[in-house]
Amino acid sequence: MRSADQILSLINAYIDSLPYNRKPVSLYEPIRYVLSIGGKRIRPTLMLLGYNLFQDDPERILAPACGLETYHNYTLLHDDLMDHADLRRGQPTVHKRWNANTAILSGDSMLVLAYRYVAQCPVEKLPAVMQLFTETALEIGEGQQYDMDFEHRNDVTEEEYIEMIRLKTSVLLACALKMGALLADASPADADLLYKFGEQIGLAFQLQDDFLDVYGDSRLFGKSIGGDIVCNKKTYMLINAFNRADEAQRAELAHWIELKTFDPAEKVAAVTHLYNIIGIDKMAEEKIAHYFECSQKYLDAVSVAPERKAELMAYVARMMNRKY
């Protein structure tokens, strides 16, 4: 079996070797840029680790695994444009380095390339793989639309938020694990268990991302801390701050949400202080731990020897202990 670090090296080498030699250069250069500025490569790593539970040659599925990474980066490229984000992984976003039209068109091309790479799998697996990938892509779009809709609502519930992040984030991690299992000839039951495992891990991962947006280190995080607060994003933390706040705290939160002109650093500091007083930081940490613990029962039920699961378990544990 390969270690997660060995798998990551395979993925990075494969991505670096992708020949973006079509023209015009102005279309493909942003794609090369997006895929070269780092990233944790979580989705292709999970796909190869899922495959490696059942088979010992994960390099066979590098093309579809990197298709998922290309798709993921396509979504980030368009998300950054919609969010007016200046930085991604500590580097200028595509629409800042080039322009909005380039971000749209290069992103569209990344989506097409993602399908090309994912389709590079055994022909007998193609229908199941493409059905899984297409359904996942549709769900991610639905999640993004919910996220945008929430910007105009003040009554978003915790349940609605969890469903939104399941669609926007969790399903792609779940897809990666299930696709790896399908390509490794795993049983349908084991493939479905890995999907459910990925869903729970994805929920924990996104909640952790929300947490780090407030409490992370911007030097490690690769983008400005407090961006969700500045934009009044309906996160698990903001929703529950309103739910748990007393009358005075709720009024102060509402004051910062309603302000049209403000100093961003002052707003982030004030809202973070309220989170701390209300206990939202601890509440979020407990919710993250809950989903991580729930995930383990699905992985435990996968019918392979425990020693074959060790690397996947260790990798996911490292994901949950990240600081960025």
Regions found by a protein language model. Give the residues of each.
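All-alpha prenyltransferase/terpene-synthase fold signal
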Residues: M1-Y324
